[in-house]
Amino acid sequence: RQDEPLILSSASGYQLNPKLHIMTDYQRFDELVSSAVRASSVINKVDILKNALDLYHGKVLSSADGEHWLIQFSTKYHLSYMGAVSELLKQLDSLHSYDLLNQYAMKSLTIAPDNPKAYCWLIRSLKAQGMNELATNELAAAKEHLTTEEYEEILAFGANW
């Protein structure tokens, strides 16, 4: 299929040539997140979500961030990523898998420092491990990165620590 063009142009815009059966990381991410919802066990769900999150490295085409044609697509995947992270962290907490929880929470906060749920699960995990000073440091970081309302949400969640 070397004679097939990679990108097709139409009246509605550009698209990857469907005859080439190309799957992007973002399509694979969507597929994995959907599979995680249907997973039969917590362990399967965790494995699938880890695979999905390992594909996500930040906003789609960040060099074109703010372009009107990209905003809806980029926002959809960013919100889907934050939802998948929150679900993975919740499942890891239920398994008391704190090392993995810490790892994925920290990675997610480098990609999306505006995710209050990642802070919640990370702080909860650190406290569960007796790492109170680190938990306090993360709470301070959350206060810097989040809105007042989001920060108060973390404090309310903290009543369960």
State the predicted function of each range:
Residues 1:
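DNA-recognition element of transcription regulators
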